């Protein structure tokens, strides 16, 4: 009975921890569901920035690229290189997915440092980078999970599931657990780094408003770019792994 009671108390404690939220949130009711309004607002802003930038850069393509077109061609070539390195020769269909992930995360991360979200007042909570919310990073990680399952199944059919009993059926639970830990590691790594960066800047601004935060903000911009690259690279690596069938 004591063991059972301790187990129940442990589960209750874990349930309480799972209900803890980081900061206050501004909620919207959409179709009976409660969603974080500030995340949707900032995500729409990021998407609008990406669409507007791409439209302006390629609306009148030139044989000799202009500055904007040249920049986006460089970004596309960079994403192609990352995809080809991680996925292999069949990387082509996955370039749009990897590129979307990289650009959305990159602009989201930078928006937390460059856009004055704090001046927009909300009834509850405050605006911040979309990747500062665990819901966004988990959603991106789940999309990646769907992508690599789809890649494996489309390439190998039901034979894809044979990887779970390789090299021995004894490893079946571990191999299954590995596929669940991939999205967890992706989401928490991105969320933790972006949240920590913004918290450090806020604390330093409150202590020394004009001097110390500047180098920290530049470091944050560099870190934000690295996090976007890591996420996109790992997503491509997982897709390539599912298509090749080896670890």
Swiss-Prot record:
Record-linked InterPro entries: ATP_syn_F0_a_bact/chloroplast, ATP_synth_F0_asu, ATP_synth_F0_asu_AS, F0_ATP_A_sf
NCBIfam families for this protein: ATP_synt_6_or_A
Pfam families named among the record's database cross-references: ATP-synt_A
Source species, domain of life: Eukaryota
Location(s) in or outside the cell: Plastid, Chloroplast thylakoid membrane
Protein name: ATP synthase subunit a, chloroplastic
Transmembrane regions listed in the UniProt entry: 38-58, 95-115, 134-154, 199-219, 220-240
Membrane-related topology note: Multi-pass membrane protein
Summary of the function given for this chain in its UniProt record: Key component of the proton channel; it plays a direct role in the translocation of protons across the membrane.
Underlying gene: atpI
Species per Swiss-Prot/TrEMBL record: Lactuca sativa
A GO molecular-function descriptor: proton-transporting ATP synthase activity, rotational mechanism
Keyword Transmembrane helix attributed: yes
GO cellular component labels: chloroplast thylakoid membrane; plasma membrane; proton-transporting ATP synthase complex
SUPFAM superfamilies listed in its UniProt record: F1F0 ATP synthase subunit A
Subunit structure, as described in the record: F-type ATPases have 2 components, CF(1) - the catalytic core - and CF(0) - the membrane proton channel. CF(1) has five subunits: alpha(3), beta(3), gamma(1), delta(1), epsilon(1). CF(0) has four main subunits: a, b, b' and c.
Keywords, ordered alphabetically: ATP synthesis, CF(0), Chloroplast, Hydrogen ion transport, Ion transport, Membrane, Plastid, Thylakoid, Transmembrane, Transmembrane helix, Transport
Family, similarity comment: Belongs to the ATPase A chain family.
């Amino acid at each position: 009975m004591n063991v059972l009671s301790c187990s129940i108390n442990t589960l209750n404690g874990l349930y309480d921890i799972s209900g803890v939220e980081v900061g206050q949130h501004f909620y919207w009711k959409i179709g009976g569901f409660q969603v974080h309004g500030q995340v949707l607002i900032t995500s729409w802003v990021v998407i609008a920035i990406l669409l507007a930038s791409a439209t302006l850069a390629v609306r009148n393509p030139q044989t000799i690229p202009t500055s904007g077109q040249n920049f986006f061609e460089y970004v596309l070539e960079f994403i192609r290189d990352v995809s080809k390195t991680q996925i292999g020769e069949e990387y082509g269909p996955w370039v749009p997915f990897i590129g979307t992930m990289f650009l959305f995360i990159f602009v989201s991360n930078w928006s937390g440092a460059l856009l004055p979200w704090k001046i927009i007042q909300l009834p509850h909570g405050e605006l911040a980078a979309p990747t500062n919310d665990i819901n966004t990073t988990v959603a991106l990680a789940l999309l990646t999970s769907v992508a690599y399952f789809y890649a494996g199944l489309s390439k190998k059919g039901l034979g894809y599931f044979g990887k779970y009993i390789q090299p021995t059926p004894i490893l079946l639970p571990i191999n299954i657990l590995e596929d669940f830990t991939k999205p967890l590691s992706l989401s928490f790594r991105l969320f933790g780094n972006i949240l920590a960066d913004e918290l450090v800047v806020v604390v330093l601004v409150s202590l020394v408003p004009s001097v110390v935060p500047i180098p920290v903000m530049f470091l944050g911009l560099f870190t934000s770019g690295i996090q976007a690259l890591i996420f996109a690279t790992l997503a491509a690596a997982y897709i390539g792994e599912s298509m090749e069938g080896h670890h």
